[in-house]
């Protein structure tokens, strides 16, 4: 394993053709994002080797018992149908669902990555991360992240009853929203130094989500793609040996339609 910005990076099996999505934020009521998810699963089953979810599949996930109830069970069932049909699904944890654990793997048949993932996608050496580790200037979040992911904190949280876990998640979300609305907004952007550190492991391409801003460009001798929040417009990324193309899933008659290439990302200093 390699560590980048406190994130353990796993090496994964290559995929010549892949679908990538991020930040679905599936809430307790499901919502329209499920239609886009179903379309992405269908496209991946028909034309890809793997589906990659780059974090925040769920709006919140705290305790292991959640996978047996409500929307968490519904999404798990969708994934199980796909994996039983032969689709490889790789799910990275995000800042909202970092407490996903073995119960998720058992229910879905997916691979769970608790850090980053280095993989050959379409023949290109690629690093996949959620993206929160790149936002190093968001000091309050980075400090909270360290104790939230401490083994003791994880043990207590994952053992909670579902009702208590949901109340705790709602309280934390409200507090987070208040923090986000105050102060210098540039601190929520990836820092140039952090992005350079990610590329320093030797990859040719970096793909991440988290900041909910669709972007794409070059960085030094590599290239990057920032996935937008999937729950906002159903946009993800298709990769094959011929290149990479952003697409919108589940809108209109077609399962996937191409969208315009986004502009470059802004970095914080």
PLM features: what roles do these ranges have?
Residues 118-121, 232, 254:
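A short acidic, often aromatic-flanked loop/helix-cap motif at beta-alpha or helix-coil junctions
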Residues 107-114, 127, 132, 137-144, ...:
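Conserved beta-sheet core of the metallophosphoesterase superfamily
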């Amino acid at each position: 394993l390699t560590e980048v910005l406190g994130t353990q990076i796993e090496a994964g099996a290559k995929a010549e053709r892949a679908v990538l999505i991020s930040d679905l934020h599936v809430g307790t009521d499901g919502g329209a994002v499920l239609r886009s998810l179903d379309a992405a699963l269908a496209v991946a089953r028909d034309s890809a080797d793997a589906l990659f979810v780059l974090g925040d599949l769920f709006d919140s996930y705290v305790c292991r018992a959640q996978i047996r109830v409500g929307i968490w069970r519904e999404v798990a069932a969708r994934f199980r149908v796909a994996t039983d049909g032969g689709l490889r699904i790789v799910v990275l944890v995000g800042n909202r669902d970092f407490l996903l654990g073995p119960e998720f793997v058992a229910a879905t048949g997916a691979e769970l990555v608790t850090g980053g993932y280095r993989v050959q996608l379409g023949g290109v050496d690629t690093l996949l991360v959620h993206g929160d580790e790149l936002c190093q200037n968001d000091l309050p979040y980075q400090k909270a992240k360290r104790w939230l992911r401490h083994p003791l904190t994880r043990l207590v949280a994952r053992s909670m009853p579902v009702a208590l876990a949901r109340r705790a998640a709602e309280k934390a979300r409200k507090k987070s929203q208040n923090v986000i609305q105050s102060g210098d907004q540039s601190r929520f952007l990836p820092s140039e130094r952090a992005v350079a550190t990610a590329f320093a492991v030797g990859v040719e391409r970096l793909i991440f989500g988290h900041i909910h801003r669709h972007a794409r460009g070059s960085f030094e001798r590599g290239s990057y793609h920032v996935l937008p929040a999937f729950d906002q417009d159903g946009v993800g990324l298709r990769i094959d040996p011929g290149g990479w193309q952003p697409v919108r899933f589940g809108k209109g008659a077609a399962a996937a339609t191409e969208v315009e290439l986004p502009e470059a990302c802004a970095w914080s200093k």
